[in-house]
């Protein structure tokens, strides 16, 4: 059996992780000087409940090579001979490089090992890498080989389309995604920036006034960009407001001819630190 692993920014639900035996290397979150492991020491609902009251913005840190090594070693001890690790974009974090170092350390220690390890730089964030991970798990369950799953990821990883909008511009300002002037103008005009990924980095691709316009934007972009042969499922993400994601799901079902699964999953602490409360996202395969 092929082992699939990732980092905690993939934001897949606990149910999915358990169902497909996917292991995560946790990022760290520094909250008022105390360091937590994402999804180990702190969980999304707990974090979002305290977020507004925090006097300063939390910071995040990438998983260490040791975290990846631990998962790889456990997988090998369990009898896995093939390991695929799908990481958040190297353009936004050092997580990919940490995983590469962990793999290199393993083969330095065991140069004659017949274990296969492939590290994927997903060029994605949040449920974008999560989309690839879930697709890889489904391929594995259907009998795809290690080589076939690796080839799919490397060929199609840049086709995972991201859309993410935020409710609080201060988080994008703090993370360097907005200038101070843009944030001020956005607040005055009640504009919600819409972000996507370009060359493995986050970029603002649009602005809409009000949530209703945002959901309309998402639906129209899906109709225009979706590859019906490749989009087996859609993932919708949210930080604190599940109802908004449900509304977007209903709109997609009403306004488009998509008949596949639409998964709703909460964004985790690491991603939520940068996008804040009220964020909503959509992920699918584009043409």
Predicted regions span which residues?
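Local beta-strand N-terminus motif with an aromatic residue
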Residues: 1-2, 80
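Mixed-charge interfacial surface used for oligomerization/domain docking
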Residues: 3, 9-17, 22-23, 28, ...
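N-terminal glycine-rich anion-binding loop in soluble enzyme alpha/beta folds
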Residues: 3-63, 67
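Glycine-rich phosphate- or other oxyanion-binding loops that anchor nucleotides, phosphorylated ligands
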Residues: 53-104, 146, 150
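Short amphipathic alpha-helical segments and their helix-coil junctions
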Residues: 70, 115-116
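Short acidic, glycine/Ser/Thr-rich loop/turn "cap" segments at secondary-structure junctions
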Residues: 84-87, 117-121
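Flexible loop/hinge segments that line or gate small-molecule binding clefts
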Residues: 112
């Amino acid at each position: 059996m092929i082992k699939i692993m990732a980092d905690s920014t993939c934001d897949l639900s606990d149910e999915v992780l358990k169902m497909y035996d996917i292991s995560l290397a946790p990022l760290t979150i520094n909250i008022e000087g105390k360091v937590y492991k994402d999804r180990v020491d702190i969980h999304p609902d707990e974090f979002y409940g305290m977020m507004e009251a925090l006097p300063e913005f939390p910071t995040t840190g990438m998983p260490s090579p040791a975290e990846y090594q631990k998962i790889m070693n456990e997988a090998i001890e369990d009898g896995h001979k093939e390991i695929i690790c799908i990481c958040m974009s190297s353009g936004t974090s050092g997580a990919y490089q940490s995983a590469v170092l962990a793999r290199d350390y393993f083969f330095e220690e065991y140069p004659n090992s017949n274990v296969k390890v492939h590290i994927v730089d997903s060029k994605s964030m949040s449920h974008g890498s999560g989309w690839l991970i879930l697709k890889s798990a489904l391929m594995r369950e259907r009998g795809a080989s290690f080589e076939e799953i690796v080839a799919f990821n490397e060929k199609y990883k840049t086709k995972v389309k991201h859309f993410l909008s935020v409710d609080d511009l201060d988080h994008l300002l703090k993370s360097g995604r907005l200038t101070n002037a843009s944030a001020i103008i956005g607040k005055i005009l009640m504009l919600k920036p819409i972000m996507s990924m370009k060359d493995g980095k986050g970029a603002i691709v649009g602005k809409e006034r009000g949530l209703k316009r945002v959901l309309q934007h998402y639906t129209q972009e899906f109709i225009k960009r979706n590859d019906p042969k490749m989009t087996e499922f859609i993932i919708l993400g949210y930080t604190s407001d599940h109802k908004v994601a449900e509304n977007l799901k209903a709109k997609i079902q009403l306004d488009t001819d998509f008949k596949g699964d639409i998964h709703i999953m909460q964004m985790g602490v690491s991603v939520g630190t940068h996008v804040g409360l009220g964020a909503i996202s959509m992920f699918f395969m584009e043409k």
